[in-house]
C-alpha cells in the first residue's frame, strides 16, 4: 500500500511539473537573428541599434540577436536560406540577386523581402578644381582611388565605370577613403570615388589641402542610360556648401541600405517591429 501511495505521489508530482512547465514553453520568446556587417561598419551599427532599441528589446514575443557578417552579399545569402531572419542589404544586391544577375553568381535569391528603407549611400567623385575633369569619362588614363577591394564602394564603382566603358582605361587604386584622401593630397591620385553619406570626413580632409570639385555623376548616368539598366539607383543632390570650395549643388545618385526579411518570418512579427518608430531607432546609430 505504501508503495502504491509513493507511485501515486510521483505521478501527481510529474503531472504537476509538466503543467507548470507548459505555460513556460508556450510563452518562450521567438529568437530572431539580424545580420549586420563587419565590426565597426554601419551595417553592424544598425543591427546593434535594432537589437538594443527598448521597445524591441522588451518584447515578450521575440528577442533579436545582432550578428556580424561580411556585409550586404552575405546578408542576402543568409536571409535567403533562413540562417538569418533579418539583415541589412543594399537595394542593388536585392534587385540583382532576385534577377540572378549578381557578378559570378546566377542564383536567384527569391526569399528575401525588403521591409524598410534605412539610409542612402551616395556616389561622390572628387577631383581637383583645376584638373579639367568635368565628367567621369575624362578619367581615362588617370589614377583613381576606387574604394577598398570587396567593398560596396568598389563594387559600385566597378559597375558604373564598366557601364561607362572606362573601368579598364583608368589606373585603379583600391584603397579606403582616408587613404585615398591622403594620396590625393600628395598628388598620387587624380581623383577618388566614395559611396557613403555626406559630408564625408575623407572629402573634408582632401578639401583642406586642395581646391576640390565634385563631378556631376547624374549627367553621366543619364547620358549612358545607367538608370534604365539599374533602376534601383535613385538621383539626389549634394548641396552647395557641403564641402569647402564646392559652392554649387552637385547632382549624383545613390543606392539604398534596406532592412530585409526572410519570406517565412511571420507577418505579425514584421508588422510589430516596423510599428516601432524607425526614425528613433536610426537616431541611435
Q: What are these regions, as identified by a protein language model?
A:
Residues 91-93, 101-103, 131, 168-266:
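Pocket-lining segment of extracytoplasmic ligand-binding domains
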